[in-house]
Amino acid sequence: MVSLAVGTQTNGSVIRPASFCGVYGFKPTHGLISRTGILPQSPPLDTVGVFGRTVEDTALLADAMTAFDERDLHSRLRARPKLLETALSSPPLDPVFAFVKTPVWDLASDDCKAAFDELADVLGAGCDEVNLPGPFDGAHAVHRTIMLADLAKNFAGYYKRGADKLSGTMRGMIEEGQATLAVDYNVAVDWVELLNAGLDEVFARYDAILTPAAPGEAPAGLEATGDPSFCTLWTLCGTPAITLPLMEGSNGLPIGVQLVGCRGDDARLLRTARWLSAYVDRIAE
């Protein structure tokens, strides 16, 4: 319908829909693109992302949007990354991938699991299955604590003026957030650095993490937008991630591959994503 689009992700609202729609979706490092003007839900998590037809599309748009903004408290003052230029370059060596199933692997559909096992086999020596350390098992609960406490704060006016007009799901989320203690919130926020320290060990050996973007194909019906569980960990850690539309499920609908990079290394992730897309295309010929 359009060549480029912009979205936001607090849990999985860039990576997941890109997977369902068979397009590329790029969620940059938290703070890389300013969020000034968007409705805040959870500032430690909220991230502006982009959609495109190719890796190059997403790199082009993200490049144009990347800048320091003093109005955004999480905006990072640093050298502007050359996203498109790096994405278009060739890696000095073939990338090596860490296939991470994450603690929510059991939520993946059978065809999703089979497709990822096949991709790992195709990559051969360039892909190792890697298990994350024990603390990552609690990451989803940490994300929920942060997200709902912030939601309760930022949506307090809507709740006060018209709680009866909100959906039952939204009311429940706000009320759960209202019950969060400040000490629990602060502990949850501190977890982010602990988890990223664990990820740094992975990225010292691998160019990117390979993992599902969603549990499988898009769900039928309009009651829900799908399960974001495969995005939660990476949103919490603030790492860059990109969806590549490389697979199909049993119903012929897209299943996206999610690549995750080290915080701040967005350009390298985009270059790796472009390499993998081209590699899979060559194998499929």
Where are each of the predicted segments found?
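A short, small-residue-rich loop immediately preceding and capping a beta-strand
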Residues: 1-8
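Small-aliphatic-rich amphipathic alpha-helix that forms the alpha element of a beta-alpha
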Residues: 198-200, 224-245
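Short, surface-exposed loop/helix-turn segments at secondary-structure junctions
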Residues: 75, 142-143, 187, 213-233
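Short helix-loop capping/hinge segments that flank enzyme active sites or metal/cofactor-binding pockets
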Residues: 91-100, 142-196, 200, 245-256
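Structural helix-boundary/capping segments
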Residues: 8-103, 117-118, 122, 180, ...
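Short, high-confidence coil segments that cap the C-terminus of an alpha-helix
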Residues: 2, 206-207
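Acyltransferase
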Residues: 83-86, 110-132, 156-161, 185, ...
